[in-house]
Amino acid sequence: MLKEFQEFALKGNMVDLAIGVIIGGAFGGLVNSIVNDIIMPIIGLITGGIDFSNMFIQLAGDPKTTLAAAREAGATIAYGNFITLLINFLIIAWVLFLVVKLMNRLKKREEAKPAPAAPSEEVLLTEIRDILAKQQKA
């Protein structure tokens, strides 16, 4: 049973999948940082200093000035957070699109290469004749 599990776990596809998941997690963190630390501040500057992380509609309770305080007071719609996550998604989707496009292009190049021509029957027969002739002389 342990041997079967080891064969299953160490198959190429399983290891590739595990590596992909780990790299994907790291890539997600990188995209979050790019969006939160670079893109959103630039968008905030362009839009007159709007802080998207603190944009919300408070549905209940006394009006609050921060999203955290509004969430403690009651239900809120955090649309600024949604905008940030939407930008995250679009960046990840775009990068994945580019990766898949590149892989498809490389795959087409690989398929386009013609297979080496097989030697003709005459060439093979000539080689066999030469080998037999050498064996008879020896």
Swiss-Prot record:
SUPFAM superfamilies: Gated mechanosensitive channel. It holds the Pfam family MscL. It comes from the Bacteria. The keyword Cell inner membrane applies. The keyword Cell inner membrane applies. It is found in: Cell inner membrane. GO terms for molecular function: mechanosensitive monoatomic ion channel activity. It is a multi-pass membrane protein. The chain crosses the membrane at residues 15-35, 38-58, 80-100. GO terms for cellular component: plasma membrane. Keywords: Cell inner membrane, Cell membrane, Ion channel, Ion transport, Membrane, Transmembrane, Transmembrane helix, Transport. Belongs to the MscL family. HAMAP family: MscL. Channel that opens in response to stretch forces in the membrane lipid bilayer. May participate in the regulation of osmotic pressure changes within the cell. Homopentamer. PANTHER family: LARGE-CONDUCTANCE MECHANOSENSITIVE CHANNEL, MECHANOSENSITIVE CHANNEL MSCL. This is Large-conductance mechanosensitive channel.
